[in-house]
Amino acid sequence: MEKEEIAALIDAAASPHIALAIHLLFATAGRIGAVLDLTWDRVEFQRGIINLRLDNAKTRKGRAIVPMNAGIRAALKTAHDAALSDYVIEYAGGKVKNIRKGFEAACRRAKLDNVTLHTIRHSSAVAMVSNGVPLEKVAQYLGHSNVAITYQTYARFAPDHLQDAAEILDFVRIREAR
């Protein structure tokens, strides 16, 4: 997804909890389960980190501890000031279990087709890789236990991926150098 589409999707969310969830998904590159499980005690404004990990995690999927950027920090501060529960994503003081309907409605309003909640995680990873963030850091950000997983999925989005191989095969330049 492009930056304009991301902004349009967040703006198209009809409810503050849907907008915050979408913003968190992009900012953390987290999975929806991790974002919906997030509690305020794992949002550390002082240190500038968001801890998506659970102590008693029943999931086999890795979860990360990620830094806050300025945009998500501001959104989280606003939400924290109005919080009625321990959960970051809440509605009427209770934990939100699913945002699918609100997310799909936001996609329709933003005129975005074929966008899923997991598309957001993928878009965040692609944005990091295509802007030169090393795959090792992207793997850590995504909570991947092995950088090979990240490499297999996202290496092709790196701006210089395979460029050195292409240069070796530049036979026209090699012939001109003779």
Which ranges hold each PLM region?
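C-terminal secondary-structure termini that scaffold catalytic or DNA-interacting sites
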Residues: 47, 58, 77-78, 82, ...
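Conserved tyrosine-mediated DNA breakage-rejoining catalytic core shared by Y-recombinases
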Residues: 3-5, 28, 33, 37-78
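Conserved catalytic core of the tyrosine transesterase superfamily
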Residues: 8-23, 58-59
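C-terminal catalytic core of tyrosine-transesterase DNA break-rejoin enzymes
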Residues: 19, 23, 27-34, 102-105, ...
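C-terminal catalytic core of Y-nucleophile DNA break-rejoin enzymes
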Residues: 10, 57-77, 85-105, 116
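Catalytic-site neighborhood detector that most strongly recognizes the C-terminal catalytic loop/helix
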Residues: 54-60, 142-168
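Phosphate-coordinating loops and pocket residues in cytosolic domains that bind phosphorylated ligands
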Residues: 11, 37, 45, 152, ...
